[in-house]
Every structure is written in structure tokens, then in C-alpha cells.
Amino acid sequence: MTQCHTETMKILHTSDWHLGRTFHRSPLTREHQQFIDELLEYVHAEGIDTLLISGDVYDSTIPTAESTTLLDQALTRLMRAGVQVILSSGNHDSFRRLSYGAAFFEASGVHLRTSLEDATRPVELTDGTLRVHVYAIPYLAPRLHATALGVDPTHQAVLGAVTNAIRADAAERHARGEGADRIIVMSHATVSDTTGSDTAGSADTTPRSDSERDISVGGIDWVPASLFDGFDYVALGHIHKRYPVTHTIRYSGSPLGFSFSEEHNRNGAYLIELNPGEEPTISSHEWATRVHMKTLRGTMDQLLNSPENSPYEQGYYCRIELTDETLPVGAVDRLRSRYETISHLSLIHI
């Protein structure tokens, strides 16, 4: 059982770090390092007890040397700060690679959850007066896990079986006098509020981004929020926009924007504060670290001469949408004479 050090238990919900990600072939190592530095500053300032990372800590099943170094340094700094870390694997991660050294890390306060069996093995947190069980469900590909669970190979059937197993485990612990005051579930999935419907296909209201990998099975990639009924908080990963599905079922979103479709996202995290006898207090936090990107639209003359675009000349990834009748000769070179980084150029007609 993991001991927390403050009267109010503070848990920070993050996900989808995607270490090793590039932005239109430009490495994001610098921005990821800035995010980790900012995260540590916030952890110290707020007195965070536990950090959740709900899947896709890496961008690839074979992470780069730079990305493994970033994670190693982040976990080391968090351990030194006395912060417990609960990390589940996502659809971008290799669950086998991520589980390496799990027993060693567990003893150091880093709890890796990467397998089906891990989903019903909660991390126990306590501050002496409050006991919290965190069940971390890794990404479970239906075709790989449906047979073991005895269900159809769909996301809804697999996640439904696992959440029912979690409820059964929680009930057994309660019967033994080892039950929790609060139950938190982590999951890496597409979850939509269907206003009580438990039939997949009714309505999917999830905001999407083109930087998220498709996980659909039979054309359906989402599950209803009702699968998570009865839990005190559900920390979701996979969707890159920070938003609540319901009051207690939330996506933290990614810490950085990874495509122009996320240009207007306000990336951040959720802080969950727990006190005995009280409902969880949930607040949002916005990261200052940014992947600076901007879509600029206009004629060649407007783009080269408009003073309004001066802030985007340096330090920004620019998506240029030219509205000229035809593509001007030497368009890229002319635009690069003003804008440092042009990540995408297209000719559009409006």
C-alpha cells in the first residue's frame, strides 16, 4: 500500500505524452522536455501525490533513444519528489517493452500496468484516513483478448468484461474488509456519453483529431460511458483534446498539440482532490508549453506583406493556404523568405 503525504490526496491525470513524436518530420524533443520541466514544477507547487499516465507515453512501439531518455529522466525526478506514478500502456505503446522491469519499478513507486491481468490488480493509495484503489486498464485489442474473456471481439464486449471484473474484485476486497473508500479507473479507449444508452452505434460525440490512430473494429471504435458506471473517477486516454465525457469521466488530452487539427486545443491535465467523506473535487490545469502552430490563409501578396502575420515569422510551424487562382511561381521559396518553418502548403479556392 502506498502512503500519501498530505491531508488532501492529490492525483494528477495526464495521458498521451507520445514521447518521440515528430511534427511534420520536425522532432518535438525540445517541447517534450519543456513539458516535463513544467510538469515537475507543477507537481512540486501543488504537492501532487500521484501522477496518472493513461496510455501512449511513447509514440511508437519501438521508442527512440531520445524518448526513452526523456521518460527515464521524468520518472527519476518524480520518484525523487516522492510522487507515485501509475502508467498504463496505450495502442501506440509496446506492452511488452513497457512492462520491462515492472517489479523493480513497483518497489520504487512506479506502477506499470500493461496486461489483461494487471487490470484487476489495483494500486492502493492511502493517507491514513482515506484508502483509494486505482485500477489501470491498458489498451486491450479485442482480437487479442476476447477469447480469454469469453466475449465477442469488440471494444464494448472486452471493456465491459474488464470493468465487470474490476467491480467483482472491488466487492471481494470489501467483503474481506480491505475495500476502498474511492475507486479510480484508468482506460485507454474512445468513450462517448450516449445519455444512458448501452448500445454501441447510438451516437458518438467524441471530438476527434487526425493525430489519433484508428482503433475501430467492424467500423466501431467507441464504447458508451455507461460501462464505467459506479466508479468515482475515470481517467481516460487516447483522445488528444482535454474534455469531460461526464463530470467524473474525463479525457486529460495530450500535453502538446501534434497536428494542425489540434491548433486550437488548450492542452492540460485534470487535478483530482480527495478528502474523507467528501465528493472528489476536479479542476483543470492548462500547460504553458506549446507546439506553436498557425494556419495562415491568403494570397501570396497578403501573406508576404500583412503586418498581422509578423508574430508567426519565427518559432511557429506554419500551414499556408494560398487563395491565388493558380500556384505562384517559386511559392515555397518566396514564403520561406518570411516564415521560418512552413510545414504544409496548399492551394485552395474559396
Language model segments and positions:
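N-terminal active-site segment of His-dependent metallophosphoesterases
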Residues: 3-76, 80
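Active-site neighborhood of phospho(di)ester-bond hydrolases with catalytic His/Asp-centered motifs
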Residues: 14-15, 51-55, 85-91, 111-116, ...
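Active-site environment of divalent metal-dependent phosphoester hydrolases
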Residues: 18-21, 59-62, 88-98, 118-121, ...
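Metal-dependent catalytic neighborhoods of phosphoester/phosphodiester hydrolases
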Residues: 24, 57-74, 89-109, 114, ...
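Conserved catalytic scaffold of divalent metal-dependent phosphoesterases
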Residues: 100-216, 255, 275
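Binuclear metal-dependent phosphoesterase catalytic core
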Residues: 120-128, 132, 137, 249-313
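Conserved beta-sheet core of the metallophosphoesterase superfamily
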Residues: 198-278
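Conserved small/polar residues in nucleotide/adenosyl-binding loops
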Residues: 348-350
